Amino acid sequence: MIAPVTHLATATTTLPLDTAMPAPVIAQPIVSFKDVTKRYGSFTVLDGLNLDVAPGEKVAIIGPSGSGKSTLLRVLMTLEGIDQGRIEVDGESLTHMPGRNGAQLIANERHVRKVRAKIGMVFQSFNLFPHMSALQNVIEAPVQVLGVKPAEARERAAELLEMVGLGNKFEHYPSQLSGGQQQRVAIARALAMRPKVMLFDEVTSALDPELCGEVLNVIRRLGSEHNLTMLMVTHQMGFAREFADRVCFFYKGQIHEQGTPAQIYENPQQERTRAFLSAVREAN
């Protein structure tokens, strides 16, 4: 089991239930967003965002559509650039690199690839290679990107597919797998790169309830058995409450409110948070 996150400042962990939790003070965050702004034309999707995540912490990100949740993950994975600010992963800047005489330069592609290798991401769509079997999908990146020997990559891929409950599907192609099975292959593929941080972007949104449960069970197991830091964008409120160490409610490109699951779900302090959770309950 992952040990409880004990290196947050105690002031953030001793608040009564009816007090909104401030941003925790984390001495050595594994992920850090510092004044990050991202714009699409005149629309600001991330607005001076600040967020630190502790090693091994599981953070659920909730909020209405268009609030910046998925963009947060996409800029962390460098699928999108940022307009302002700084992002760090495991003590290294993802957006800048050291230059001469202490100068900070915009990170080049080589530097970005090195830092980004510490991150794995699973998307809403499975994005599997349709012409490759489940096993080949998991083997491909370690061999081509990390230079892992094929035999070693195959052994690791087999272990991961067993772990996600697909030990009997090695040679099946994506078209022969259910949506839940494809998503579990995608999780195994991300884990094959041995990331320190895992990102999940609405990974159950395209699945029916039964298949959704299959995927959430795998993520639950990852959280309990592996020392991975996880950031999950989700509308699965029950799962987020059970799974997360911290819940961040996004609104208009900022963290509008954050706290423990009990604080956010039982006694949110901000009216916009209360309205969102009420709408979710009514929809369900």
Indicate residue ranges for each PLM-predicted region.
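ABC-family P-loop ATPase nucleotide-binding domain
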Residues: M1-T37, N284
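C-terminal boundary and immediately downstream tail of ABC-type ATPase nucleotide-binding domains
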Residues: I2-P4, L8-A9, Y251, Q258, ...
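ABC family nucleotide-binding domain
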Residues: I26-P261, Q269
